[in-house]
Every structure is written in structure tokens, then in C-alpha cells.
Amino acid sequence: MSWIERILNKSNITQTRKAGIPEGVWTKCDSCGQVLYRAELERNLEVCPKCDHHMRMSARARLHMLLDAGSEVELGSELEPKDILKFRDSKKYKDRISAAQKDTGEKDALVAMKGTLQGMPIVAASFEFAFMGGSMASVVGARFVRAVEQALEDNCPLVCFSSSGGARMQEALMSLMQMAKTSAALAKMQERGLPYISVLTDPTMGGVSASLAMLGDINIAEPKALIGFAGPRVIEQTVREKLPPGFQRSEFLIEKGAIDMIVRRPVMRQTLASILSKLTHQPQPSVVESKADTVAQPENQADV
């Protein structure tokens, strides 16, 4: 066998081995670049076990992480977006909706459920950032209001996980109207003395940060989450100055008093259960095992 044949044979073996590995088995951490086993990362709640980077998480995964198994009942699932304005930019709005629905399996960018958290009845909502950047539109506002109404009916707390780029431009004024609509609904929660906990994840921007995301009785953020109205690049171009390191990150915001707590995802469920038991004057709930209880600790770091 000639030297060229030996090289070609090695190349064929390598290609055969690569072809045998299905796509999506491995992924790379956006922060440290570590190659991670996808199944292990999912067990770790999308938190890198090497550097503790909190990756983006789907809305349903967040709600399943929070609520007791078997207690989840979805709210407003029948609501679907409509292209009332027949809006078109580089692509028709209805085509963007169809593509987002196909990619995510969701009808719109917010999922709401009622259930229990360690035995306590609660209502929870979560934004799906993969659906058009988690943008707030008519269905998002309607589902959030449905969640508030359910909390009022059940006389229980509401928890919302925000992850959004802001109002959806394709719905124009109707999307901006959701800021007032959701804020007015939350005012009813306040009148009734029912707790509303807002959890800000990466990113929480625009109209969502200017309305429901910052109206919590307690505002909690995940580590290094980008939180603000306009993005850092837009601000730099406007003021023509370099922004300080970590500007608009959760650590910067808690230093300035804009949020109340930073909580790591592995202990988020237990932290929320503890806070809600105090706010509702209920006994400390017994710990119910969940996915969060089996999460690996990052190297050289403890729960904070």
C-alpha cells in the first residue's frame, strides 16, 4: 500500500466515525468555550458545569423545573397570534409566526401554567426567547393577563420568568398597549395583597423591562443577565461614551439597587418556595425533589 493510499484510508475512517455521531449530542459553552455533552447540560438546567454560565432555557423547561411534577395545567393555550395589520418588512409577519411556531413548537412567546410549588398553589409564566426574541405582542399580553386572573381567582402568588427583546414591532401600537395592559393587571394583584415575583433572565430588554418585568414585589435576576431598556451598543452610539464594564448586567444592577437578589438557577426553585412561604404566611414547605436537586456544582464555586 502506497503512502497516499494509507492517508486516504485514514481519512475515510475519520469521516465514518464522524458520520456515526448524530447532530446535537455535543454543544459548546458560549462563555468558556468548553465542549459539553448535551444530555448532561440539560440535566444541569442549562448551566455550564465548568464556568457556571447560565445559558438560555426554553419556557416549558423553566416551568417544569419550577412546578411540582404532575401539577401543571396550561393557561391560555387556545390563544394564537393574528396578522391584523398585514405587516410586512423583509418577510411577511404571518410567515415569521409560522417559522417561529415550527422552530419552537409554541404558538407564541409566553407560556403560562398553574400548579403547585412544593405543595403551595401558584401561577407561573415564562417567556420563550426563541420565539421572535420573546417579543411582547397581543397573545403574550393576553396570556399574562390570563395568568394574573387565575392567580386572583385562586388567591395565590404569581411568578414570571422574563426573557425578551421588547415589544414586537410587527404589531405596532397593539404590542405597546400590552405594557399598560399587563401593568394594570398587576395593580389588581397589589390591591389584593397577592405576591408577584419577577425573575429576570438573559436578556430582559425594551418594553418588557419597562413594564411587567420590573414590577415584582421582589425582583430576582439570574447571574450575568442583561437587563435594561436600550441595548449597550445603542447607548454607546447615542452618548458617544464607552460604558463601564458589566453595565446592564445583573451584578451591576444589584449594586445600584435596581434589583433585589441574584439567584443561581440550581437553587432558584427552593429560593422561590422559601420566599413565597414567608410572603403568604405559610409554613416552610417540605423539600420536594426536582431536577434542580441533582445539578452539578461548578468548579470552585458554591451556591449563592
From Swiss-Prot:
Catalytic activities: N(6)-carboxybiotinyl-L-lysyl-[protein] + acetyl-CoA = N(6)-biotinyl-L-lysyl-[protein] + malonyl-CoA
Binding site for Zn(2+): C29, C32, C48, C51
Domain CoA carboxyltransferase N-terminal: 25-294
Disulfide linkage: none
Pfam families: Carboxyl_trans (PF01039), Zn_ribbon_ACC (PF17848)
Pathway(s): Lipid metabolism; malonyl-CoA biosynthesis; malonyl-CoA from acetyl-CoA: step 1/1
The entry's keywords: ATP-binding, Cytoplasm, Fatty acid biosynthesis, Fatty acid metabolism, Lipid biosynthesis, Lipid metabolism, Metal-binding, Nucleotide-binding, Transferase, Zinc, Zinc-finger
Co-factor note (free text): Binds 1 zinc ion per subunit.
SUPFAM superfamilies per UniProt: ClpP/crotonase (SSF52096)
Protein name listed in UniProt: Acetyl-coenzyme A carboxylase carboxyl transferase subunit beta
